[in-house]
Amino acid sequence: MRTKSFSLLALAAVFTLSACGGSQNSNSNSAASGAKTAGLDVNKTYIVATDASYAPMEYMENNAVVGFSHDILDAAAKSQNVKLEFVNTPFKGLFANVDKGDSDIGLASITINDERKQQLDFSDPYFEATQMIVTTDRNANIKTFADLKTRPASVQAATSGDLILQDLQGKDSQNIKRFETMPLAFKELESGGVDAVVGDSSVVAYYVKQNPNAKLNTVVDPSFVKEHYGFAFKKGRNDGLREAINKGLAQIKTDGTYDKIHTQWFGTPPGNSAAASSASQ
């Protein structure tokens, strides 16, 4: 069984979302006793659609969904007496799944952007990331994102990495190789089918650390903007679910639960200065 706790100091510096500190001795019962959100059905089990192929954020382990994003949503929900059931759902159809009402919440390390906000509503941000490039020694001349202008690169389809590569190479570029999951995109690089992978720093750094024999290298480009993850809801939904999750996020950031979960997964609390030092090496 893979352990949750690992040291990813460089990773934490690149994409940590600063959270409010607080006493870690607070228990969930104090949060659960708070005022009930108007319209929320506390007797209902809400369905969460998640693309569980995105370690360490959300992935399958022993036939169950685990990961940092899972733990954050689960803790936020429990603090408000909200019951959840997590269902593994391919990312490509996840937005439509939520939009049609087949699921109540979308959980897939979803970057909040203006285009997606036209289709879905989002929770408050719970994590900060950026894009990252992965190469091998045979492509050591790739130093910046601009170097991928005419180079074949793999991405997970419909992700932020896919979108920024389209901006660089053009939407119809034959050099963009799209895959259903990030592990498949990485395997394409390792087999020599592409020169690079572009993906979220959270997943990229974890994969590189977990696969040392692949001898992968990471490239951070200063042009990559910060991205914020949020939980997705059907546009215009007004049954109190999103409000409850936002209350829960605020609660776990205040009582120290967020910091505890972050440390379990990344080896350091958010905003740790030691992490920033390690990342610069």
Residue ranges and their predicted role:
Residues 29-109, 255:
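Extracytoplasmic small-molecule ligand-binding "clamshell" domains
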Residues 16-19:
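C-terminal motif of bacterial Sec signal peptides marking the signal peptidase cleavage site
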Residues 83-147, 222-223:
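Acidic, polar ligand-binding/catalytic clefts
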Residues 46-50, 145-160:
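Short loop->beta-strand "edge-of-pocket" segments that line small-molecule binding or catalytic clefts
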